[in-house]
C-alpha cells in the first residue's frame, strides 16, 4: 500500500501541520498488519514530518525504515526515532543556487548523527541527466548514489525491505 501526504500533512504549514494525523493513521496500519514492514519517506519539511511521525510510532509494531531527503526544520532536532530499524538520510551539502533559499532559511539538517547512512550530494555536481543536484529536485538524491563507492537510498531501502518481508 502507498499513501501520499502533502509536506505539512494537509495542515497550514510548519506551525499548524498535521504530522500527528499521519502518525495515528500509520500506527493503525502498522497494528493492522504487524509483520508488514513500512518505508516512510520525506523530503524537505516532509523529512522533518516523517521523523516526527516515526517518533510517535510504537516500537513493537511493524518494522519501519525511514528515508529523509534534504530535511528542513529549525524547530525539531534530527534525533533518531526509537522505532526506526534503518534510517537513511540524503542531503545537499553545498551549492544549490538562488532557488535553494527555502532550505537555507528553514534550516537544512545536513548530516544526521543517528542515521545509519548519510549520503552527501554536492550542488555543484550533476546527476545522471546532467542537471545540478538541488533541493527542489529530490528524486536524484533518492535514486542515485553520491559517488561510485556508495549505493543509493533506494537501493539500501530495497535491501532492508527484502530482509524484512515475511516469508
Range-by-range predicted roles:
Residues 35-37, 61-63, 84:
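A general structural motif
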Residues 41-46, 50:
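Gly/Ala-rich beta-loop-alpha elbow adjacent to hydrolase catalytic centers
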Residues 67-70, 90:
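Alpha/beta-hydrolase-fold catalytic nucleophile elbow
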Residues 80-167:
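C-terminal catalytic-base region of ester-bond hydrolases, centering on the histidine
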